[in-house]
């Protein structure tokens, strides 16, 4: 008899075995709406991170972080006796996953702690950086989140190396499990790129970049990276430092750089500043072949305790470290701010070489060994650069900026400070979310500024009178609801942009978006502006109402009237205090990325996409931070209120539009109706009476999914039930109010 006990569960465990997605890979991901619930959060429901951060002694914490920078540990010794460059990389790679396409990624949730980011090839050794920070995090506990601490540490690292940063804002709350909604690409191998480009791009092997035979310069010049991705290969933050797919061509690399940094909201000047500024510090690591490097953290053994990439070469650390496979130190002052990067970039001619790991890099021609060794003060090395560094000299636009920065170090320092602040704060949303004594006073255009409240607010009596005025103005329930929804639903919970505050729906580019029906929108806004002007002219004591508030109040009035028509007296909660932004405060190009490609709540799609309409609905709902029941009740309510774009009848499953009823659900689930697609594309459907064949309804995939998908049908059945009318109205009002207030960080 063996000493190993027989497993009572036949060697299976909870969660093991074939899953639903194994059987049905295209199953709708309704579960994406259930992320980051209280069930995964170890903190009390009453915990308020903002209040905890406000009590933090930030200056003392920064002093302790500064001391850590030069407190080299034997288990992971600091390059050049200074951890600053490592922590700059940690902060950069935390924030640098942000992309403008959907606002997801970034450092705002502390996701670098979790898979896949904690095990990305581009994040080798950052597990050690976080472990070096653990004693400080342990000391301060929940007074500072991991998300804030990683960014703050990057700032302190720069300051400890003689650089003056632009500022720091806290306010990033940790999450406690990996994000599931982030689309990183479809590749199944690290550093692959075969799916993100239309022409295919085999990528590179796990060791380092290698030139792939079927990629030529012409293809690489014209390839188009899939949206919303902002990295050229699976597991990279931005670009391959050896060049596209390992092709050491600086001009081709410039194209990838411009594309990926642009998708992170950086222009050419910010891009040059970030690359040159970041590469003023530290080094890359490629002491030997990557075959010496073991599994990443998520694949490591229990005894590794969450650390990965064990290195069998030499000591496995210090001068024997292997990360990217490249072995480059850019400056003679790798732990001190200087202009050395540009001095070397333009002061030497460069020839292609290879690192000890076999990766493409560049070495200065006819140069002396002037670069310090990271761990042996008696050694000097030749100046080296990456292919992506040389892009700043070879690309004409980048070169012009680089030469200007070289000649004007103060401009370079200011540009890097501002670009670093933008990099590390881009996903935080408006300044109203910024916390701490180091928040810079200057207001920046990319922060989507909104004027500070400068007038007395309306009271409940004013709101009631204004609602009556709006309802008597000739505007319909559908028009008021659609306008309020269009304004508020531009919000993205990913990067906290958009929303009703600012009334940017009246400004370019939002006023011209097809989803907002520009002609109807102009009519509604003109009427509301007249009501606003008339009300404000009659007030005393500085009381005013903004158009942003009036748009929401008008939508609330329409919802109340529709509920009353259904026999339910409700008052939709309303909190005044929104302000109106100006066109000068609105970056048209920056806001363009917020335009919806689809909005299932309005049965709108800009075009037909490879992604299903119902999947795009889930995506939109997730960006609006909605749960599955909230999404369901909103779709059903908006349909019967007539909020469809273009006044489409698709999904309007009611004979009494404008009445806030549960008719959408009752009629969708009516077994007397038989549904058939109207074309081979199966985008729209027709519902006919099973017995008579009489036409009853038309609907889209977004409508029918609430009867087709088993999870959504379960929710829809609740609202379709005979006893659900009052619950439906109350739940709709609650979900509507949530969307209207998503950007009201001042109410928190």
UniProtKB/Swiss-Prot annotation:
SUPFAM superfamilies: Heme-dependent peroxidases
Molecular function per GO: catalase activity; heme binding; metal ion binding
Catalytic-site annotation from UniProt: 93
Site feature Transition state stabilizer, where: 89
Tryptophyl-tyrosyl-methioninium (Tyr-Met) (with W-92) crosslink residues: 238-264
Keyword Iron listed: yes
GO CC term (a single one): cytosol
UniProt: heme b binding residues: 279
EC top class named in words: oxidoreductase
Keyword Iron: yes
Cofactor info, note text: Binds 1 heme b (iron(II)-protoporphyrin IX) group per dimer.
Covalent cross-link site, Tryptophyl-tyrosyl-methioninium (Trp-Tyr) (with M-264): 92-238
Catalytic activity: H2O2 + AH2 = A + 2 H2O; 2 H2O2 = O2 + 2 H2O
Keywords: Heme, Hydrogen peroxide, Iron, Metal-binding, Oxidoreductase, Peroxidase
One GO term (biological process): cellular response to hydrogen peroxide
PTM comment text: Formation of the three residue Trp-Tyr-Met cross-link is important for the catalase, but not the peroxidase activity of the enzyme.
Cofactor dependence: heme b
EC number: 1.11.1.21
Oligomeric and partner information: Homodimer or homotetramer.
Annotated family: Belongs to the peroxidase family. Peroxidase/catalase subfamily.
Protein name per the record: Catalase-peroxidase
UniProt source species: Xanthomonas campestris pv. campestris (strain ATCC 33913 / DSM 3586 / NCPPB 528 / LMG 568 / P 25)
């Amino acid at each position: 008899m063996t000493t190993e006990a027989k497993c009572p569960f036949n060697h299976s465990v909870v969660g093991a075995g074939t899953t639903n997605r194994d059987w049905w890979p295209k199953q709708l991901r309704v579960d994406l709406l259930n992320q980051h619930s209280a069930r995964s959060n170890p903190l009390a429901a009453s915990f308020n991170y903002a209040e905890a951060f406000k009590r933090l002694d930030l200056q003392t914490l920064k002093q302790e972080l500064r001391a850590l920078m030069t407190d080299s540990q034997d288990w992971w010794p600091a390059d050049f006796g200074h951890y600053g460059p490592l922590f700059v990389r940690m902060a950069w790679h935390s924030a640098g996953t942000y992309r403008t396409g959907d606002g997801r990624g970034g450092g705002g949730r502390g996701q670098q702690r979790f898979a896949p980011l904690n095990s990305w090839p581009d994040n080798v050794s950052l597990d050690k950086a976080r472990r070096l920070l653990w004693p400080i995090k342990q000391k301060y506990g929940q007074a500072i989140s991991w998300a804030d601490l990683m960014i703050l540490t990057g700032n302190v690292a720069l300051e400890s190396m003689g650089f003056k940063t632009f500022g720091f804002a806290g306010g990033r709350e940790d999450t406690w499990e990996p994000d599931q909604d982030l689309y990183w690409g479809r590749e199944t191998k690290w550093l692959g790129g075969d799916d993100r480009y239309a022409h295919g791009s085999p990528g590179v092997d796990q060791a380092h970049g290698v030139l792939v035979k079927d990629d030529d310069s012409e293809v690489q010049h014209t390839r188009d990276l899939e949206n919303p991705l902002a990295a050229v290969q699976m597991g990279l933050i931005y670009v391959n430092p050896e060049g596209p797919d390992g092709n050491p061509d600086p001009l081709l690399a410039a194209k990838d750089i411009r594309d990926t940094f642009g998708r992170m909201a950086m222009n050419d000047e910010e891009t040059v500043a970030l690359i040159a500024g970041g590469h003023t510090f530290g080094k890359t690591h490629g002491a030997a072949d990557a075959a010496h490097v073991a599994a990443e953290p998520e694949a490591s053994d229990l005894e590794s305790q969450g650390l990965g990439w064990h290195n069998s070469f030499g000591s496995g650390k210090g001068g024997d470290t292997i990360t990217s496979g490249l072995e480059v130190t850019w400056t003679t002052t790798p732990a001190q701010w200087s202009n050395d990067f540009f001095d070397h970039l333009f002061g030497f001619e460069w020839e292609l070489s290879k690192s000890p790991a076999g990766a493409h890099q560049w070495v200065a021609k006819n140069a002396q060994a002037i670069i310090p060794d990271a761990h042996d003060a008696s050694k000097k090395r030749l100046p080296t650069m990456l292919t992506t560094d040389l892009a700043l000299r070879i690309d004409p636009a980048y070169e012009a900026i680089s030469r200007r920065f070289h000649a004007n170090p103060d401009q370079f320092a200011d540009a890097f400070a501002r670009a670093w602040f933008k990099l590390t704060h881009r996903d935080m949303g408006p300044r109203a979310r910024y916390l701490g004594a180091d928040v810079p006073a200057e207001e920046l255009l990319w922060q989507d500024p909104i004027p500070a409240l400068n007038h007395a607010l309306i009271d409940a009596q004013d709101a009631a009178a204004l609602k009556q005025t709006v309802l008597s103005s000739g505007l319909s329930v559908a028009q008021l609801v659609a306008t309020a929804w269009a304004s508020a639903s531009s919000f993205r919970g990913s990067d906290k942009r958009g929303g009703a505050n600012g009334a940017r729906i009246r400004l370019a580019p939002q006023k011209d978006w097809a989803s907002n029906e520009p002609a109807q929108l102009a009519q509604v806004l003109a009427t509301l502006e007249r009501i606003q002007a008339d009300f404000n002219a009659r007030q005393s004591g500085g009381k005013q109402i903004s158009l942003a508030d009036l748009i929401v109040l008008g939508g609330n009035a329409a919802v109340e009237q529709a509920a009353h028509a259904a026999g339910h007296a409700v008052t939709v909660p309303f909190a005044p205090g929104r302000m109106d932004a100006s066109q000068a405060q609105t970056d048209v190009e920056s806001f363009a990325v917020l335009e919806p490609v689809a909005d299932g709540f309005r049965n709108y799609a800009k075009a037909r996409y490879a992604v299903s309409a119902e999947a795009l609905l889930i995506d939109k709902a997730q960006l609006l931070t909605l749960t599955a029941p909230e999404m369901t009740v909103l779709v059903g309510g908006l349909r019967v209120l007539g909020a469809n774009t273009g006044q489409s009848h698709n999904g309007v499953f009611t004979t009494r539009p404008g009445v806030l009823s549960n008719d959408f659900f009752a009629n969708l689930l009516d077994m007397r109706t038989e549904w058939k697609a109207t074309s081979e594309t199966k985008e729209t459907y027709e519902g006919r009476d099973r017995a008579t064949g009489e036409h009853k309804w038309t609907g889209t995939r977004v409508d029918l999914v609430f009867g087709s998908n088993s999870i959504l049908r379960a929710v829809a059945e609740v609202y379709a039930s005979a006893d659900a009318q009052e619950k439906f109205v109350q739940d709709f009002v609650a979900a509507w109010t949530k969307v209207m207030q998503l950007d009201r960080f001042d109410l928190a």
